[in-house]
Amino acid sequence: MSFASNATGFRIPLTTCVYPSPILRFNAKVGSGSSYGTTEAQRNMKCVDGIGRSRVVAVAASGRTRDSNPEVESEKMKEMIRWMFRDMDDGEVSVSAYDTAWVALVEDIGGSGGPQFPTSLDWISDNQLDDGSWGDRKFVLYDRILNTLACVVALTTWKLHPHKCEKGLKFIRENIEKLDNEDEELMLVGFEVALPSLIDLAKKLGIEISDDSPCIKNIYAKRDSKLKEIPMDLLHKEPTSLLFSLEGMEGLDWEKLLTLRSEGSFLSSPSSTAYALQHTKDELCLDYLLKPVNKFNGGVPSTYPVDMFEHLWAVDRLQRLGISRYFQVEIGECLDYTFRYWTNEGISWARYTNIKDSDDTSMGFRLLRLHGYDISIDAFKAFEKGGEFWCMAGQMGHAVTGVYNLYRASQLMFPQEHILLDARNFSANFLHHKRLTNAIVDKWIISKDLPAEVGYALDVPFYASLPRLEARFFLEQYGGDDDVWIGKTLYRMLYVNSNTYLELAKLDYKHCQSVHQLEWKSMQKWYTDCNLGEFGLSEISLLLAYYIAASTAFEPEKSGERLPWATTIILVETIASQQLSNEQKREFVNEFENGSTINNRNGGRYKPRSRLVDVLINAITLVAQGRGISQQLSNAWQKWLKTWEGGGHQGEAEARLLIHTLHLSSGLDESSFSHPKYQQLLEVTSKVCHQLRLFQNRKVYDAQGCTSRLVTGTTFQTEAGMQELVKLVFPKTSDDMTSATKQSFFNIARSFYYTAYCHEGAIDSHIDKVLFEKIV
């Protein structure tokens, strides 16, 4: 383990400094945000990604603040995020020019002959880009061609803005042949059906769009093939994903279809619902469309509402970025909202959508179970068919992100939850294959680094994922407001993908890292002053012990837990590594017992003959300082020493010692130790840690540097033990202990799992990354 340097050339400081104190306090200091760029269509702050927004919301979406004082900026960003969560309703999502065009095509159902939604035509007029196209600021030709043709058709239908139409047509004619060169992974949902429908509409209006090129002929062929596969009888009988893309389809029985709408919409699709309104003049369809038209100043998103999607993914981003602790109230409200609409069939992207999908269900299940909600696994049964798990009925293929979220959810299984075991096996195999074939590209999102996200999940599973390690990697993987989603058109979720989240997370991480680096220097000073190197303890082991503690109890105010955790690991390793006879071990234990008894009685006048015993007693005294727990800590150490002397299960004894040390250090009353739940947690955790310590001595690694599977008999027991621990830790019960106390058991087990699971080289790189690499 090359701990002295990292990939960037930074050398870990080896100079001495203050003795490690179990109580170090630092004020939170965080830094500034970044600026936000708008497209030409958004000039003069008319809108942000097509949404009419106030300056406050625009800043909140972008992460830009004006103050240079880091602490003030940090608080402003936290307040922005709280405001964003309070503002969550049916979803802050960018406007789709394509869907807006279909809405604009609707003729007044009152019979005036004019447009039903004139403000939608205004939106189209106001949002043409300088090159003549309409669409997202990220240039994807599928998106620009579809949006532009739809807007030209809408404006031409109402004989408006011929110069804008001509400019749009010029863009289409110059670029449509280039579709042949586009990456098919970026093709929009239903593009091969939507584009021919628009071309046919354009022809009826006298708009000439060449359809005899090989490129367009190929798209028409795909359209014809897909339409032949659509079971028209099924389309009219029950809700399916086909309802999302009705626009342009012919031969529909609207009387039957209207029975399948939910809250006035067809699968929350404005364009599909607008097409239905054109043909039926249905009042419920009209009422549905008025909501987004009014909210977004004439424009409409490609999907609306997206409330479940927004609530869940926003919480997930805060958690993975390591800043969720600042927003516990807001997160609780989001999850209460989700739980209110949970069903045994799962959930969807919107609360009233009448078909469910495994992607939103997986994310909802994972977050609800993590936060103690009583949540059923029955929903996953609806998505399993023939050994595979599908996002929704009728799906033609698997999306990487959907399977990725299924994989993450499956890792929170309780014992005997076989459907989640099946889901984990399927999703893990699918994702491993995608990685091996370099095919981690998703059909739902264009994100900064999806392969790295999936890679981390495979290499460092939930049981091994230390909180600070996950945050450090996700800071590099999360694209903020540059991430864009793929639907019928490209779209953005302003409260899911936000530079405000990213900037606050970076600044928070930098502050935590600076605290950890100061503590690491003090640990080195303590190591030198105690001459621990003479007892065979290397600085590598010292660093690993501190890293494990700092990556778990990472918050600056938790130095009173980090330092006792690290020193306990270090002293256990140092003592256990001594080559002592049985008699020498007995003398060591006796001397500790005598020394700690005298010290506890008369204030520390006893000087033991063994320097290592002296180091141990002094460490206990420092941890106990000002807390009145010296005797309790000594008792905990005596139990571990007795196990060490007798050659008992070291991993189990170490876990018990570590748990008691952390709980005493954090102020937990010793009376809690006799709580039945505490005893149960202690028993399961200590056994799991013992099994992991045994496994650590005979693990086999794969090419990625982590064990590809836990394969020994002991390890199968470990997996069962971890499942039992998850069941004990995360659910909330009426006679329960605090969630923080229960979580600490899982944290200890996770630290053992991490060191057993990951290769030394991987751990080495993690240490450099978490503690020493600078955040850019």
Curated annotation (Swiss-Prot):
Transit peptide: 1-60
Reaction catalyzed: ent-8alpha-hydroxylabd-13-en-15-yl diphosphate = (2E,6E,10E)-geranylgeranyl diphosphate + H2O
Subcellular location: Plastid, Chloroplast
GO molecular function, one term: terpene synthase activity
Binding of Mg(2+), residues: D357, D359
Organism superkingdom: Eukaryota
The entry's keywords: Chloroplast, Lyase, Magnesium, Metal-binding, Plastid, Transit peptide
UniProt pathway annotation: Secondary metabolite biosynthesis; terpenoid biosynthesis
Motif, DXDD motif: chain positions: 357-360
Cofactor dependence: Mg(2+)
GO cellular component terms listed in the entry, alphabetical order: chloroplast
InterPro entries reported for this sequence: Isoprenoid_synthase_dom_sf (IPR008949), Terpene_synth_N (IPR001906), Terpene_synth_N_sf (IPR036965), Terpene_synthase-like (IPR050148), Terpenoid_cyclase/PrenylTrfase (IPR008930)
Pfam families associated with the record: Terpene_synth
Binding site for substrate: K226, K443
Enzyme superclass (EC): lyase
GO biological process: gibberellin biosynthetic process
Keyword tRNA processing found: no
EC numbers for this chain: 4.2.1.173
Annotated family: Belongs to the terpene synthase family.
Function (record text): Involved in diterpenoid biosynthesis. Catalyzes the conversion of all-trans-geranylgeranyl diphosphate to ent-8alpha-hydroxylabd-13-en-15-yl diphosphate.
Domain remark text: The Asp-Xaa-Asp-Asp (DXDD) motif is important for the catalytic activity, presumably through binding to Mg(2+).
Protein name as it appears in the record: Ent-8-alpha-hydroxylabd-13-en-15-yl diphosphate synthase CPS4, chloroplastic
Origin species: Salvia miltiorrhiza (Chinese sage)
Species lineage: Eukaryota, Viridiplantae, Streptophyta, Embryophyta, Tracheophyta
